[in-house]
Amino acid sequence: MMGIMVLCLTSCQNPGQIHRPNADTLYVGSVQASFPTAYMPWLSREGIAPTIAGMLYDSLFSYDEDTGNFVPSIGQEWYYVDQAGEPILTEDGSIDYARLEEVYSDPSHKYLAVKVIIHDNITWSDGKPLTVEDVYYSLDIATNNLLSNHAGALAWTSDLRHKYTNGVLTQRGLFTYEHGAREQGYEIAEEDKDTVIYLHVNKVLGSVMPLFTSVLILPKHIWEPVVTPQNQLNSAAPTEETLYRYRYPVGSGQFVLDTEESGSQQIVLRRRTDYHRTKEDGSPLYNIETIKYVLYQEINVAIYALLKGHIDVLDNSVSSNYLQLFEKEKDLFISNAPGTYIQTLVLNVNPVSSEQNPIRDLLSIKDFRRAIALAVNQEDLIKNVLNGAGIPASSGLMRSTLPDFYNPDADYLPIDYQARVAEANAILDTIVPDRDKDGYRLLNGERITFSILGSPGEQDCISYLEIQFQKIGIKVNYAAKGTQPESTYLYTSRFDMTLHGVSFSLSNIDIMYNAHFSALGRTSNYGRLVNRELDTLIENMRFTLNLNTKYDLIKAIQPILAEEYYKIPLYTSNVISVARTDRFIGYNIVEGSTVLNTSTLQNLKKSNVSR
């Protein structure tokens, strides 16, 4: 297979000349089905769209997983406040969680009060100043589905105590100088009216996370004049005025879209000279003046373009099969970054009644699921599927690189694989002892066979799982998940097993634990797991105001997740990406990211041997 790849990449196209004519432009290859033509940041969260949106627009803050702190963006600082509006901070300026619990643990207090102060020197790309009225507008419309028509925005703001019913504001949880701050008891001086906003959020320590990091702030002066219940923000049939705003974005991010140069085959971004965030010495935050994204629809063609010098960076993770090829090339920076997503095998443990059948019913038996989990050999998958570019994943589905949350007690299954297979067969001999002439187990005379939903790129993984499960007499095969697996199969229980990547950390756990293991319906709990003990622990973890208790509950949840054998870990894959070093240097490896990450963009500079 590797020889075929190399032959194709070196001979299937004529070399041609190097197409990086501008020395100040970073040429970035992106493998997508297509490039977006509309850039309203809430329109799409797939493909390259969120990457571009994150460069054109800003959120209030970003989150640093390593430090656990919010990094200023539009927001300059934030803190919880008490009933008198006084900051709940320690002497060193960090959140005083002990006092927060003391102040708000009383059940009579229904919410946490948060004060956000934004920078006073931000402008939109059209030159208009950005104020808290833009922040208010963005969070307000996110809660008003009659105007936004955006289910994701409702999820981002689910813990914000600012609610609409049929377009009517029924509960106010946002307060500025112009919107009820004084009436609520928050005194904002007139000179601070453009920079201070108060939020009321549910008594959940993670409630501010999506409000701060997921909601890209929109310019009120651009959208308020055109958005109505008849012409919603997220419109399938936008008016001419709305369509113009989609295509010619006005943002507050570090780049602006060059609409004249951008089109269906390329996206050109120009660095703003007036962006409010800079390096400590006052120089631009990013050294790159222009970024040109070039569309490729095949990964092999994109790699060929990189090797031949048509692009500087390939902004896609690639298979570890290409590592051998890259290592033979000069002028390449290979990023083999640790991954943050755990690939899991999700079992349909509780399908809706219309999708139940005798074979699928076996997955509702916990001991049967334990046998499946025992048969998984992560080391073998990492060796053969990832070519060694990955690490084993915990049965508690928490990364061991997060020591404050990872609980090794969740990893209690035997380490020796032969012992695991022997135990799995002993379990199955008590449940489905009959086998056919090929050694596969039978149920009522029928071979037990499960289909595993996956993408074409996941066929290798499923093929090796087929070999592993054969050792315990269980037959599995690959089933294409298609383009809309959630609505076609997963939300409707029309599957046996599926591959699914998960990633849990303090930044998402309040939402994701519930979505993956408790909530039913259109959630990531595809197999409809129901475990009341687990539900209670997740609920307690979510609502405790004691940070130490929260950490303890996160650890307590992991062994219970492991014992359900519901989302069985397969591996954590590295994120492999590549860039050229003949024109730019300063690429950084960041956990869970391709080489084109924020750290790289802030450190990239021209190479002395640029040519």
Residue ranges and their predicted role:
Residues 64-66, 213-285, 290, 421-422, ...:
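Gly/Pro-rich hinge or "lid" segments in bacterial periplasmic/extracellular proteins
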Residues 579-611:
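Long beta-strand-rich cores associated with HINT superfamily self-processing modules
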Residues 29-105, 250:
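N-terminal lobe/hinge region of extracytoplasmic solute-binding protein
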Residues 255, 391-436, 454-460:
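Structural transition elements
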Residues 241-246, 275-325, 466, 475-482:
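Ligand-site clamp/hinge motif
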Residues 13-15, 366, 370, 374, ...:
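Extracytoplasmic/peripheral linker and loop segments enriched in polar/acidic and small residues
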Residues 338-341, 346-354, 396, 484-543:
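Acidic-aromatic pocket-rim loops
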Residues 152-232, 261:
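Surface-exposed binding/hinge segments that line
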